[in-house]
Amino acid sequence: MEPRAVGVSKQDIREQIWGYMESQNLADFPRPVHHRIPNFKGSYLACQNIKDLDVFARTQEVKVDPDKPLEGVRLLVLQSKKTLLVPTPRLRTGLFNKITPPPGATKDILRKCATSQGVRNYSVPIGLDSRVLVDLVVVGSVAVSEKGWRIGKGEGYADLEYAMMVSMGAVSKETPVVTIVHDCQVVDIPEELVEEHDITVDYILTPTRVIATGCKRPKPMGITWFKISLEMMEKIPILRSLRAREQQAGKDVTLQGEHQHLPEPGCQQTVPLSVGRRPPDTPGPETNSMEAAPGSPPGEGAPLAADVYVGNLPGDARVSDLKRALRELGSVPLRLTWQGPRRRAFLHYPDSAAAQQAVSCLQGLRLGTDTLRVALARQQRDK
């Protein structure tokens, strides 16, 4: 007898599904399936059903979650020569990675590319400013109803990834969402458990069925900021970049537990320095020498309206390390003056507002193990 979702909470339903799959030996590696998107016996068979969907035939770019039961779909996407996008693990360094098999990849190589190891070894990151248009989204689930209500493992990453894709214009309300589950994971889910930030699904694929849910409930229209905690902001750098963008556009980006407007989201990011070193970047001519002047009084030595000082650079840092960090945090200047031997750089922004925002966003920025000093800059005579 298959489980019935009679619990009063999402967690009740999760526990029922996990327990049933283990007790009935329906689960597959990795086990136990508790606190996971459960892999199941027959997952590859269920994945094959996606070939029968017209929406799959029409797609070119497919975003597939990295969960084990979706491995068969990732392989089919690659075999069909479609673009395969996967979420960056735990969204630590971005939103998407593109799986790029080597030229002339054999079937065995494509199979490796579809695994979690392949995601690590054959992927390249896609930047926040990349023009990505996702045609189809494939997510894992712990439980799903024939009406299209979905329950994940409880961390909220699939819902957040979708909301972030909406925010960056990668998906629209017309983009179909597919989930792949065992038949026992298709259960009744009370609609009152479904929240506005929850992603719903349009198709459910099991080893024995293809279910078109006909779900009419609107999908999330973007990031629900008041559901985002400060802890999550610290864990996910790209959230800070998206928040800064939406705040600049005049949107309400108040976080969970906040009761007043914050000047700018603080940004802290550790950027690893490259292992293989090139010779140090040659410093350009220093026509103007600047020093940090946080809180200096107006008058002589007052901050320049649009210049930001970055100090305490690691001795072996390269300009490319800093540029990468600025891109990831959405604080790219008009021009960058690099003074590596003096362990500092200057960022030149179009106006004082952009410079102030950059100073706020870059507080706590790290390159390697060194925390950088970031402040508005003042012009001084070179000594």
UniProtKB/Swiss-Prot annotation:
Domain of life: Eukaryota
Gene Ontology cellular-component terms listed: cytoplasm
Domain RRM: 306-379
Signal peptide segment: none
Sorted UniProt keywords: RNA-binding
Region of interest called Disordered, as start-end residue ranges on this chain: 249-301
PROSITE patterns: RRM
InterPro entries found in the cross-reference section: FTHF_cligase, FTHF_cligase-like_sf, MTHFSD_RRM, NagB/RpiA_transferase-like, Nucleotide-bd_a/b_plait_sf, RBD_domain_sf, RRM_dom
GO molecular function terms attached to this record: RNA binding
Cross-referenced Pfam families: 5-FTHF_cyc-lig, RRM_1
PANTHER family assigned to the protein according to its UniProt record, in alphabetical order: 5-FORMYLTETRAHYDROFOLATE CYCLO-LIGASE-RELATED, METHENYLTETRAHYDROFOLATE SYNTHASE DOMAIN-CONTAINING PROTEIN
Protein name as annotated: Methenyltetrahydrofolate synthase domain-containing protein
Organism listed in the record: Homo sapiens
